[in-house]
């Protein structure tokens, strides 16, 4: 689902000698170099290669995540209680690329859809998922824009890949295909249009997993093109991975995350 836009914050409190300049930023524990993000705060990690974004956009209940500054994060508390109906309370995530004009360093994105081949964009992601009474998914959120850049939300296509979910939730829109084979796994496919804006296509794994390794995004992009949801002239601008949470979510964790972009001539 689409996040509404949030405020952007930086990763620490910076004080210059003499007290002439002070920048107030998310709380940092110097003892363990832990950055805590709440509400819609973000921070740059892995020397700017990725951004961690708490992105609580659908709930006013307290939710916070922490990160060590590497390509990882965990949900340390969440009182989100949106239940099984309606939109999630948030989407704590990590991303590479540009989101609402906030871009990571050296991402290799954007990249035009027409130039994407097998192995051009791959991703690995390891998670921990608590189960229990929590309602959530573990999902990629991949954004395509009609032009090369945008300072707002992408206006082409939102392509989601649910690698797992817990609780009675299914993707936005209507099921358009079932047991579709992509990259050696099977997926149910859902699509929902949004008036005057982008559409959302979701590939839900029929057998959920907690991790993926070298997931090739090309077969998903090609499938979306074949269904008429994605144009080859559009641009892939960001790859996100995280957890849409409808109920609770404490203990959800991204253990590691990477996106590799190979530009081929």
What label would you give each PLM region?
Residues 1-31:
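Secretory targeting and sorting signals
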Residues 33-110, 164:
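Aromatic (Trp/Tyr/Phe) and Gly/Pro-enriched flexible surface segments
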Residues 37-42, 168, 236, 256-258:
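Carbohydrate-recognition beta-sandwich/jelly-roll modules
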Residues 73-77, 119-127, 140-142, 236-245:
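Short, hydrophobic/proline-enriched secondary-structure or compact coil segments at domain edges
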Residues 80-91, 130-135, 149-152, 169, ...:
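Short, surface-exposed beta-strand/loop "edge" segments at domain boundaries and coil↔beta transitions
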Residues 92-177:
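Extracellular-facing segments of soluble proteins and assemblies that are Gly/Ser/Thr-biased and enriched
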Residues 148-218:
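Short helix-loop boundary/capping segments
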């Amino acid at each position: 689902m689409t996040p509404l836009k949030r405020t952007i914050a930086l990763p620490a409190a910076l004080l210059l000698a003499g007290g002439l300049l002070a920048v107030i930023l998310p709380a940092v524990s110097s003892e363990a170099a832990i950055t805590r993000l709440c509400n819609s705060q973000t921070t740059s990690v892995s020397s700017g290669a990725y951004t961690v974004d708490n992105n609580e956009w659908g709930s006013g209940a307290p939710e916070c995540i922490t990160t060590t500054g590497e390509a990882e994060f965990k949900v340390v508390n969440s009182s989100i209680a949106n239940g099984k109906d309606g939109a999630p309370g948030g989407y704590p995530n990590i991303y590479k690329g540009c989101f609402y004009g906030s871009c990571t360093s050296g991402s290799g994105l954007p990249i035009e859809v027409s130039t994407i081949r097998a192995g051009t964009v791959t991703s690995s992601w390891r998670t921990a998922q608590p189960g229990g009474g929590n309602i959530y998914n573990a999902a990629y959120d991949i954004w395509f824009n009609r032009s090369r850049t945008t300072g707002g939300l992408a206006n082409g296509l939102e392509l989601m890949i649910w690698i797992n979910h817990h609780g009675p939730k299914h993707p936005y829109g209507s099921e358009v295909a079932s047991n579709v084979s992509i990259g050696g796994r099977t997926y149910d496919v859902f699509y929902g249009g949004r008036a005057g804006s982008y559409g959302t296509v979701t590939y839900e794994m029929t057998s959920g997993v907690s991790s993926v390794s070298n997931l090739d995004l090309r077969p998903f992009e090609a499938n979306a093109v074949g269904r008429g949801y994605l144009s080859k002239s559009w641009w892939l601008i960001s790859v996100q991975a995280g957890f849409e949470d409808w109920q609770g979510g404490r203990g959800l964790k991204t253990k590691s995350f990477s996106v590799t972009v190979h530009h081929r001539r």
